[in-house]
Amino acid sequence: MPKMKTHKGSAKRFKKTGTGQLKRSHAFTSHLFANKTQKQKRKLRKATLVSKGDFKRIRQLLDNVK
């Protein structure tokens, strides 16, 4: 059986925290900022954790990431 390969697109988008959770950045941060409030833009800068429902699926893609 060949080795499992890490999904490289996912590896660039998600980072594992010290407690084993996955950290991700927000969407809607590339353009069209004139339509967003300052509060929205400030909140979008912060990273957040992957939700429980998506965690198992993403973990399979990142099986080999430390």
Curated annotation (Swiss-Prot):
UniProt keyword Ribonucleoprotein, yes or no: yes
Region ranges (Disordered): 1-24
GO-annotated molecular function: structural constituent of ribosome
GO terms classed as biological process: translation
Alphabetized InterPro entries for the sequence: Ribosomal_bL35, Ribosomal_bL35-like, Ribosomal_bL35_CS, Ribosomal_bL35_sf
Similarity field: Belongs to the bacterial ribosomal protein bL35 family.
Protein's UniProt name: Large ribosomal subunit protein bL35
Gene, per the UniProt record: rpmI
